Amino acid sequence: MKTKGVSKVFKSGPGGSSLRPRIVEAARALFLSRGFIRVTADDIAAELGISKATLYREFTSKEEILKAVVRSLMAEIAGHVDAIIKKEDQSIVERLVALFAFLGGRLSLLGPVFLRDIQKSAPAIWREIEDFRRDKLLINFKIILAAGHKQRLFRGDIDDDLLMRMFIRLVEGFINPTEMLRSGRSPAETFESVIKVFFQGLLTDRGRQDFSSLTPALFEPRKEGAS
């Protein structure tokens, strides 16, 4: 699924109103700090100093506001990820380290409560998030694998299609609100664990050395005799 409609998130309301992007910005801050369920339309209107009637002239429901917020977040994430991946003046190691740092920080910002609320209260929007995540993973993981193999940083004895499916299953199985709330781990900790487990098995000795020079906590070179 492409991020269809994302570019239309801030389309002006009736009469070319500039209020719509302000509503999305205010709602985003409230949703991220309190979760979706605990924020009311009255809260959003009060944050902006407008009436609820004015709010509903721009959006028909709180769910429609949520959709706009989610699509703005997806567009922002997609833009950052694409920019990192396309930095051909940097090595794939440098790009991956930057990508891990960005995604870990973004997961911490979103938090499991906000994501759980979407999963429970807005399943159609949650499916859109899952489709977006899966598609971006597939597209960018192919680029990463190709570059890593070319530089002999990744092992060549494992089928790439299998690797991609394994990585997607890991992400979907552990980087989801239900699992993060159950485990008590922060989103960043969960993401770091998934990355460590997966890439430690994928990297060649050379790849592990290159990564460890930039991310020693994640990719320490194996010591002699270590299991």
PLM features: residue spans?
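All-alpha amphipathic helical-bundle segments outside canonical DNA-binding/catalytic cores
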Residues: 93-94, 132-133, 150-166, 184-193
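Short hydrophobic/aromatic patch on the recognition helix
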Residues: 49-59
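Hydrophobic/aromatic residues within well-ordered alpha-helical segments
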Residues: 19, 62, 69, 73, ...
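C-terminal peripheral helix-coil segments that are non-catalytic and often amphipathic
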Residues: 1-10, 139, 143-151, 181-227
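Basic, helix-initiating cap at the start of DNA-binding domains
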Residues: 1-34, 38-50, 63-67, 72
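Short secondary-structure transition hinges
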Residues: 104-143, 150-153, 158-162
